[in-house]
Amino acid sequence: MEPPPAPGPERLFDSHRLPSDGFLLLALLLYAPVGLCLLVLRLFLGLHVFLVSCALPDSVLRRFVVRTMCAVLGLVARQEDSGLRDHRVRVLISNHVTPFDHNIVNLLTTCSTPLLNSPPSFVCWSRGFMEMDRRVELVESLKKFCASTRLPPTPLLLFPEEEATNGREGLLRFSSWPFSIQDVVQPLTLQVQRPLVSVTVSDASWVSELLWSLFVPFTVYQVRWLHPIRRQLGEESEEFALRVQQLVAKELGQIGTRLTPADKAEHMKRQRHPRLRPQSVQSSFPSPPSPSSDVQLTTLAHRVKEVLPHVPLNVIQRDLARTGCVDLTITNLLEGAVAFMPEDVTEGSQSPPAPSAPKFPSSGLATPQPTALTFAKSSWARQESLQERKQALYEYARRRFRERQAQEAE
């Protein structure tokens, strides 16, 4: 039986904070005056929480006091199956939802979390992160930290996804480096619920996330402890990471994907393109209803068809009419953003490519075959090895299109 299709990045990351439902939007507008008052009040209370957490030593009393004060701020921390917590395990593994996940888990148990891709600073320390050296030395530093004989031992809380998701659909691919530190890890699941607005937005800063957390009535963090997992004999770190990812995803009722933080960055870039599309459509096609624009659209579609002969012509025309940009249409087709059934190259190729066939005797025939494999029916298959093939496809398609354009200009 074929596994369910993995969700794409558009389902793992929220791009809008406000609700799209009219009733919820009206409720948010009515709540706004109360929320602003809570925000101002909680900002002053939050300063006291920060001072108390700095003044008190790490202990059960400190965690109880700070946890109670955080509940007043609207940050409610709950946990399930706390009896499964094994204090001998030095590495804790969790999914990542908000910039404050490590602070919430630290209210329940003592732990330390390194801040990736950021130098040591006051902001790093004030946010509750552990100050570490450069990224290249991170793993070795963490191994030394876990090997220390300090009592009581302080476990590491690591987020192998390295980027936060919306916590509803699936998990990013787990990086292997957190699983190379120790042979035993204890996973935990983290679920976050918040009324009226999204829990997190893909391109928001931690400051804006903090302000929204203080604005809404409450945010509930639900932590569930799982049994410790030991590395199997001869198991590589990548295999260990994949096994833990599938377990955490199963406990959350989600799907473990192969998407990485790089896919999130590309998704955020593509989210900005729709704002530019109406302008590009107007500049490329000044009068859409006129016959001349239809002729121009057909001409551009045939040019793209010459570059990507396995793509149906009507699919190319439809996406060109929407984007008005040849480069963007080629990108959408190569990345699988436009669904279609690939044509056979011999059937889908048109007569115009014949004059330029001698120029590309080998690449013109060999390149479309792996491209056709990219657009499988299963989204899981489309995501496999995307990073390895995408750049080569971009360069080939765009180079071929520009060379044909230069030939016609001559």
From Swiss-Prot:
Tissues/organs with expression: Ubiquitous.
Name the InterPro entries for this protein.
AUP1_CUE, CUE
Q: How does it sit in the membrane?
A: Peripheral membrane protein
Q: Domain CUE spans what residues?
A: 296-338
GO molecular function: any one?
ubiquitin protein ligase binding
Phosphoserine, modified sites: 292, 363
Which proteins does it associate with, and in what oligomeric form? Identified in a complex that contains SEL1L, OS9, FAF2/UBXD8, UBE2J1/UBC6E and AUP1. Interacts with the cytoplasmic tail of ITGA2B, ITGA1, ITGA2, ITGA5, ITGAV and ITGAM. Interacts (via C-terminus) with UBE2G2; the interaction recruits UBE2G2 to lipid droplets. Interacts with ubiquitin ligases AMFR/gp78 and RNF139/TRC8; this promotes interaction of UBE2G2 with AMFR and RNF139. Interacts with apolipoprotein APOB.
Q: What does this protein do?
A: Plays a role in the translocation of terminally misfolded proteins from the endoplasmic reticulum lumen to the cytoplasm and their degradation by the proteasome. Plays a role in lipid droplet formation. Induces lipid droplet clustering. Recruits ubiquitin-conjugating enzyme UBE2G2 to lipid droplets which facilitates its interaction with ubiquitin ligases AMFR/gp78 and RNF139/TRC8, leading to sterol-induced ubiquitination of HMGCR and its subsequent proteasomal degradation. Also required for the degradation of INSIG1, SREBF1 and SREBF2.
Quote the protein name from its UniProt record: Lipid droplet-regulating VLDL assembly factor AUP1
Q: Which organism is it from?
A: Mus musculus (Mouse)
The gene designation is Aup1
